[in-house]
Swiss-Prot record:
Location of the region described as Disordered in the Swiss-Prot/TrEMBL record: 362-399
Motif placement: Substrate specificity: 23-26
Native source species: Danio rerio (Zebrafish)
Feature type site, description Substrate specificity: E274
Record's protein name: Polyamine deacetylase HDAC10
Recorded family membership: Belongs to the histone deacetylase family. HD type 2 subfamily.
């Protein structure tokens, strides 16, 4: 099984620059590349990655995405003087040429292909290519927007040709629309392209009508192009997560990619003069983490834009931390996406409802996508309503300050496992069996028993409680362990013990995710615990800190589970922001189809609570235990395969729960409020 992350970088790609005055191009500087690599080296991340050498892309590889005429024209640039380079650059839009840029562009494309090879040959699980010039604006016969060759488009076509791939997902989180990628694949159903980008109703570069949400692809490619336009600046962590939860991830799981390529532009981060957005660098840790379970972990991240050197370096580090499997940082202050973001999300979901099962129910349940455009009076940009003056100077992106991201240190032990007595289990790397229970742990077990379980005498159950407390202490108090898995016999007692111990000191909030029927003794009315229950029997919820999802068994059970996970459970969980996640599987649940997605849920919920996840499995099921340990250890999870359409009853149930809870948990919202 592949493991590790590749890092591809060569300082040679920094050896070109703007040779004349051009305000539109002056922000694209060599330091973008060197600062990114230096940040990785300073934080010890470059040293933890597998260094893969750069190579030049061949002409045949470049011609996968570009015309011979364009390639021949670019090949002439090394022999041009400055005046000739200026004249050549003026043929295109917002791009400059240099005598060394052809060489660097071949290296950038070749580095991207090296990354694809490393991932597809399973030499590594994933990786990042730090490249320059960027590529996503470049078109078949035109340079554009600092881009010469379209690195990601070439990579996708190369992967299709060399590895016989039928489904590639390209995620473009750069703040500009990657129109070059869209043009390349808009008729190709084998490539799903998702781009969010600053648009402002076509007033922002590249000012194209085809960058709007209504451009869904052409012919056989209809539905495989998803544009999510940002129609105002200042988008936040909440807006980005809402886009992932309510648009990208449902479609991505339905598409079931064999490879994920990210056009990673970090001009969508806070402080960037191009994007003028407010999302923190830490958000890229989570965006990366949320994509990693797809395609059995095969993920290639390729640098695009990013023009604030501070937020660029921080964002690159956050991305690579997640690729390496380090615990994700907690993000506080999440809530409802802004009205402008919700309008775009709603419009995308509506226009894509003809193509994706995840959205098919929206034709009846959501409003017409042709809503009036938001302006400053109803949720649109307000920047122009307060002109700058000496007493009220308008802040630029460079004036914004934000806290330095906290260090993300991997625990010395990834996963501690407590199987049933007598069961031998071969553990993945960086996992270990729990040791003997300490004297202090034994005393804590006795204290909890005396206080809550006077009549408990079963030594096996008491031993389980000791193991639970021991693992929790190593996770929460010493940070020695990231997560754990304990097989228990009495679920009720075990859950009560875990919550009692966790809430006494280290964890101010605990998220409980319970897969199974029957009641758990969990109190949620004090706001310290949020309970999610996924079951097959009807239950009634009244508390805003409880979410019960009764899914109908059958062929669409997996699709229903994933829709609930992505559209309901994760939004609530991220906003709740727990310090600990308690994942629980009841004895009967292991025998249902729910277990096919348990591994994916276990992976995804580790984005919460800095990865502090304790799973309790009732009874011994070898396959379930191995699946759980594999997911906790960060190993790749097998794809689910294409998802079936949801049952109408499940859709209705989920929408009722969304309506019930979204007033309290705003990240559930995916439509603009009508009030």
């Amino acid at each position: 099984m592949a493991s590790g992350s590749a890092l591809i970088f060569d300082e040679e790609m920094s050896r070109y620059k703007l040779l004349w005055t051009d305000p539109a191009c002056e922000i694209e500087v060599p330091e973008r590349l060197t600062v990114s690599y230096e940040a990785l080296r300073t934080h010890g991340l470059a040293q933890r990655c597998k260094a893969v050498p750069v190579r030049q892309a061949t002409e045949q590889e470049i011609l996968l995405a570009h015309s011979e005429e364009y390639l021949e024209a670019v090949k002439q640039t090394p022999g041009m003087n400055v005046e000739e380079l200026m004249a050549f650059s003026k043929k295109y839009n917002d791009v400059y040429f240099h005598q060394n840029i052809y060489h660097c562009a071949k290296l950038a494309a070749g580095a991207t292909l090296q990354l694809v090879d490393s991932v597809m040959k399973r030499e590594v699980r994933n990786g990042m290519a730090l490249v320059r010039p960027p590529g996503h604006h470049s078109q078949r016969s035109a340079a554009n927007g600092f881009c010469v060759f379209n690195n990601v488009a070439i990579a996708a076509l190369y992967a299709k040709k060399n590895y016989n791939l039928n489904r590639i997902l390209i995620v473009d989180w750069d703040v500009h629309h990657g129109q070059g990628i869209q043009y390349c694949f808009e008729e190709d159903p084998s490539v799903l392209y998702f781009s969010w980008h600053r648009y402002e109703h076509q007033s922002f570069w590249p000012n194209l009508p085809e960058s709007d949400y209504s451009s869904v692809g052409k012919g056989k490619g209809s539905g495989f192009n998803i544009n999510l336009p940002w129609n105002k600046v200042g988008m936040t962590n909440s807006d980005y997560l809402a886009a992932f939860f309510h648009v990208l991830l449902p479609v991505a799981y339905e598409f079931d990619p064999e490879l994920v390529i990210v056009s990673a532009g970090f001009d969508s981060a806070i402080g960037d003069p191009e994007g003028e957005m407010c999302a923190l660098p830490e958000i890229f840790a989570h965006l990366t983490h949320l994509l990693m379970p797809l395609a059995a972990g095969k993920m290639c991240v390729v640098l695009e834009g990013g023009y604030n050197l501070t937020s660029l370096g921080q964002s690159v580090c956050q991305t690579v931390h997640s690729l390496l499997g380090d615990p994700t940082p907690r993000i506080s202050g999440l809530g409802t996406a802004c009205d402008s973001a919700l309008e775009s999300i709603q419009n995308v979901r509506n226009v894509q409802s003809s193509y994706w099962s995840s959205f098919k129910h929206l034709a009846q349940s959501e409003t017409n996508p042709k809503r009036p455009r938001l302006d400053a009076t109803n949720g649109g940009p307000k920047e122009s309503s307060e002109p700058a003056s000496e007493s009220n100077p308008k802040k630029t992106a460079q004036d914004i300050v934000w806290p330095e991201p906290l260090k993300r240190m991997p625990a010395s032990v990834r996963t501690v496992v407590v199987p049933p007595p007598g069961v031998e289990l071969t553990l993945p790397k960086n996992c270990q069996h729990s040791g003997d229970i300490s004297e202090s742990t034994a005393k804590e077990v006795q204290r909890i028993r005396d206080k809550h379980f006077h009549d408990l005498t079963d030594q096996n159950i008491l031993r389980s409680l000791g193991n639970i407390i021991s693992v929790l202490d190593r996770m929460m108090r010493s940070d020695e362990v990231c997560n754990g898995c304990v097989v228990v016999s009495d679920l009720s007692v075990s859950v009560q013990c875990a919550l009692q111990h966790a809430l006494t000191e280290p964890a101010e909030r605990v998220l409980v995710v319970y897969v199974g029927d029957g009641e758990l003794p969990v109190k949620t009315n004090d706001g310290k615990v949020f309970l999610v229950q996924i079951c097959t029997k009807e239950t009634e919820d009244k508390c805003v800190n409880r979410l019960s999802l009764c899914l109908r068994e059958g062929e669409s059970l997996t699709a229903g589970f994933m829709q609930a996970l992505l559209g309901l459970i994760l939004p609530v969980a991220y906003e709740f922001n727990p310090a600990l996640v308690l994942g629980i599987v009841g004895e009967t649940a292991a025998k249902t189809g729910l277990m096919t997605v348990w591994g994916h849920m276990t992976c995804l919920i580790q984005g919460l609570a800095r990865g502090r996840t304790l799973t309790l499995l009732q009874g011994y099921d070898k396959d379930l235990l191995e699946l759980t340990v594999s997911a906790l250890s960060g190993a790749s999870i097998s794809p689910l395969g294409p998802l079936r359409a949801l049952k109408p009853e499940d859709v209705e149930m989920m929408e009722k729960q969304r309506q019930r809870l979204q007033e309290r948990w705003g990240l559930l919202r995916c439509t603009v409020s009508e009030s």
